[in-house]
């Protein structure tokens, strides 16, 4: 999978497991957002890393989607992850809603300190026989986001 991620040098891409841990990422994904570093946990960082709120201008919606995806996950370790986040008022509030829906491919806005606002389409690919998912973000061809992403690469 490492070679695949590296071959996609023009689009940010990373791999996460069923516990929402980032297990691999290409350079552009790591440049796009701090939470796409291998070893980071996407759910934990969504609520405990203040820098993530800056990266996602639509943080309230993305946080709600993240909690709903955590509830939809079948990984038994996620109950422990949810319990570890009870110190976050926002997480507790969203968890109490009992919204359950898997992560979906959609357009997300990223605010990068050098590249500015990037509008990217999320695409996910499940890795057969594992709990791994490859996530890639693509700009609309010819858009300002495509130009900014190319500069970031």
Predicted features, each with a name:
Residues 2-153:
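Hydrophobic protein-protein interaction segments
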């Amino acid at each position: 999978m490492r070679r695949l991620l590296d071959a996609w040098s023009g689009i940010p891409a990373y791999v996460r497991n069923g516990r929402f841990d980032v297990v691999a990422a290409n350079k552009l994904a790591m440049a796009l957002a701090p939470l796409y570093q291998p070893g980071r946990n996407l759910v934990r960082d969504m609520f405990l890393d203040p820098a993530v709120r800056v990266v996602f201008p639509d943080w309230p919606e993305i946080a709600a989607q993240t909690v709903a995806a955590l509830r939809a996950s079948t990984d038994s370790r996620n109950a422990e992850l949810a319990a570890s986040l009870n110190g976050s008022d926002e997480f507790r509030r969203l968890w109490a809603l009992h919204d359950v829906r898997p992560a979906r491919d959609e357009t997300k806005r990223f605010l990068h300190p050098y590249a500015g606002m990037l509008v990217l389409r999320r695409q996910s690919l499940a890795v057969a026989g594992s709990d791994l998912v490859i996530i890639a973000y693509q700009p609309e061809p010819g858009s300002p986001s495509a130009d900014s992403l190319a500069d970031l690469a």
